[in-house]
Amino acid sequence: MQVAVVKYNAGNIFSVMNALRRLGVEPLLTDDADTLRQADRVVFPGQGEASTAMDYLRQHGLDQVILSLRQPVLGICIGQQLLCRHSEEGDTECLGVFNADVVKFRPTNHEDKVPCMGWNMIEPVVNPISKKVNPLLKGVADGGLHQAAGQGWVYFVHSYYVPICDDTIATANYILPYSAALAKDNFYATQFHPEKSGSAGEQIIKNFLEL
């Protein structure tokens, strides 16, 4: 299996590549359009600022490449946010895969700290028709730093979030409930960092590789 990691001006890419290696996959870091299109899986990770990242993607034609992908794609952290319509960060028009906008956390009291940083529970959304969680999240309730019925613990670092929407497949709560993970067609995304989330995160990456 060839797994391509999108090469662009965003941080934390090598942590993702190391997480893939721990699962026996040797990822390819690339910004080549043909290589990305031909890969079996594509990971779109990163930490950074939305407008700077989108400017880079557009200048290098990667925005259209990402939108053209038909294999499973996993956006992580800012990767999830860039797959949405718009971000308040820099008033940025994004890729528009998910029908949602990205907004900034607004503290409601002195105890609310932004950015949100640390471990938090996610709760997978059960599909009302299939009565199952999204395949990306299969088995997550059995892993993570801690355990709770129907929930998993994962690691977050972010100041902006995606409100709960039709594409939400898992929620988290920090200041207010929001989307911890999204899915639409062949695109999947997590606001948290599965590569830093212990056994729960490893399970999510494994699930992605098996989609």
Label each PLM-derived region with a short phrase.
Residues M1-A4, N186:
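Extreme N-terminal starter segment of soluble prokaryotic enzymes
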Residues V3-V25, E195-A200:
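N-terminal beta1-alpha1 ligand-phosphate binding loop
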Residues T35-L36, V65, A181:
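Structural alpha-helical scaffold elements that stabilize or flank donor/cofactor-binding regions
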Residues A39:
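An anion/phosphate-binding loop that grips the pyrophosphate of nucleotide cofactors and donors
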Residues V43-P45:
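Structural motif
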Residues G48-N120:
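Cysteine-nucleophile active-site neighborhood
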Residues S68, D101-L211:
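Amide-donor transfer/coupling interface in amidating biosynthetic enzymes
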